[in-house]
From Swiss-Prot:
CDD domains: cupin_KduI_C, cupin_KduI_N
UniProt pathway: Glycan metabolism; pectin degradation; 2-dehydro-3-deoxy-D-gluconate from pectin: step 4/5
Coiled-coil stretches noted in the UniProt entry, renumbered to this chain: none
Protein name: 4-deoxy-L-threo-5-hexosulose-uronate ketol-isomerase 2
Cofactor (UniProt): Zn(2+)
Mitochondrion among keywords: no
Catalytic activity: 5-dehydro-4-deoxy-D-glucuronate = 3-deoxy-D-glycero-2,5-hexodiulosonate
Assigned keywords, A-Z: Isomerase, Metal-binding, Plasmid, Zinc
Length: 282
């Protein structure tokens, strides 16, 4: 039985031909994830793309335990999984098997297979918002806390191409070890609005984006689909989107923003992508 403070939905895999025939409502029903952060609750979306779970936990006046859900088929949530939690709210804490870590805004924690996890906020008036990413694991790896200042930083793009940005790699082959999760954050500079353009696909990994750090009235037009058959989904702040392995994943905002990207699949090689020539986009 699912705990009373946890809600979950299931998203099945969609092939590119079916996605090309979808209208706006169908695209959003299959790929868009909203309502992630609700006070006192954990909201989870179980995706059949590489069995990735995308979710949000927003503890307020009491801790929230990450308990199992039916789709995992296990007695404990992380019995055969690993987890990454990124805090995009006020200061909070994550407890893993009795060890507590304080997460400032934009800090990350990794929980390996077999851990029991609980989330809490330091100040109920400014609650933490933990963005959750979980994928199947084959071995237990050490729990870790990575501060945003300790992440591997790359400054790329330019104002001339409207894509000046800083990339923060939380998980990478030279850093924290995971079974298959790869997670990072990109912050666009003021005046820059484009992400991941020129675009690419990676058939061996799915990806999920969480857009945040933008005003309530701002939007990001997230581009998806096969390069020759693109579609868009309009994204508001603190909303996520699933990207199948066959799909591009790019976006353009009405103002600058930040987003958290996460991948799972056959490998953790950032360079294992197929670039899409601009002239083939339609």
């Amino acid at each position: 039985m699912t705990a009373s403070h946890i809600d979950y939905t299931i998203r099945y895999a969609v092939d590119p031909a079916a996605a090309a025939r979808m209208d706006t409502d169908a695209l959003r029903a299959n790929f868009h994830i909203g309502d992630l952060f609700r006070q006192g609750r954990i909201s989870l979306t179980y995706s059949h793309y590489d069995r990735m779970i995308v979710g949000g936990a927003m503890p307020v006046d009491k801790p929230l335990a990450l308990e199992t859900i039916r789709p995992t088929g296990t007695a404990r949530f992380l019995e055969r999984r690993e987890l990454i939690a990124v805090n995009i709210g006020g200061p909070g804490r994550i407890e893993m098997n009795g060890e507590s870590f304080r997460l400032e805004p934009r800090d990350m924690a990794y929980a390996g297979m077999g851990e029991d996890v609980t989330f809490s906020s330091e100040d109920p008036a400014v609650p933490a918002k933990f963005y959750l990413l979980s994928a199947p694991a084959h071995q237990a790896l050490p729990r870790r806390h990575i501060r945003i200042g300790d992440a591997k930083r790359l400054d790329l793009g330019s104002a001339a191409t409207s894509n000046e940005r800083s990339i923060f790699q939380f998980i990478h082959p030279e850093g924290v070890k995971t079974c298959q999760l790869v997670v990072g954050m990109t912050q666009l500079a003021p005046g820059s609005v484009w992400n991941t353009m020129p675009c690419h696909v990676h058939d061996r990994r799915m990806e999920a984006y969480l857009y945040f750090d933008l005003d309530d009235s701002a939007r990001v037009l997230h581009l998806m689909g096969e390069p020759s058959e693109t579609r868009h989904i309009v994204m508001a702040r603190e909303e996520a989107v699933l990207s199948p392995p066959w799909s591009i994943h790019s976006g353009c905002g009405t103002a600058n923003y930040a987003f958290i990207w996460a991948m799972a699949g056959d490998n953790i090689d950032y360079t294992d992508v197929e670039m899409v020539p601009m002239e083939t986009l339609r």
